[in-house]
UniProtKB/Swiss-Prot annotation:
This is Truncated transcription factor CAULIFLOWER C. GO terms for biological process: cell differentiation; flower development; positive regulation of transcription by RNA polymerase II. It comes from the Eukaryota. Keywords: Activator, Coiled coil, Developmental protein, Differentiation, DNA-binding, Flowering, Nucleus, Transcription, Transcription regulation. Its main location: nucleus. Signal peptide: none annotated. The keyword Transcription regulation applies.
Length: 148
């Protein structure tokens, strides 16, 4: 016997809302992983909690690559839909602004990761890449000390 349908409205109780968010987020991440494996699809998922905490999943090794690919695709789509040069110029500026804003957010997120913050939201592969980058950076420090 299955459960009844849940009415789609905001859950007023803060604790119940948080529990539901955590469970549904886990289910969503699991489904994203399953579809990437079963269908050999490239899947990326970005979820922000109501407090702004980032949760992400990427079937690729790096979310940045997927975001860059998405930017290129959406840019090409917008170019095809905007033949007017004035509208096109305005679109280019707004797209450039959006692209740079996304890049800044990405750099800020990476900086937080380098400082050891928000690590629970990234995958094992990304943690391994982060560890490798930090090891490489640490190996360069003695050579810089010698140069000075």
């Amino acid at each position: 016997m299955g459960r009844g349908r849940v009415e789609m409205k905001r859950i007023e109780n803060k604790i119940n809302r948080q529990v539901t968010f955590s469970k549904r987020r886990a289910g969503l991440l699991k489904k994203a992983h399953e579809i990437s494996i079963l269908c050999d699809a490239e899947v990326s998922l970005i979820v922000f909690s109501h407090k702004g905490k980032l949760f992400e999943y990427s079937s690729e090794s790096c979310m940045e690559k997927v975001l860059e690919r998405y930017e290129r695709y959406s840019y090409a789509e917008k170019q095809l839909k905007a033949p007017d040069s004035h509208v096109n110029a305005q679109t280019n500026w707004s797209m450039e602004y959006s692209r740079l804003k996304a890049k800044i957010e990405l750099w800020e997120r990476n900086q937080r990761h380098y400082l050891g913050e928000d690590l629970e939201s990234i995958s094992i592969k990304e943690l391994q890449n982060l560890e490798q980058q930090l090891d490489t950076s640490l190996k360069h420090i003695p050579s810089r000390k010698v140069c000075k």
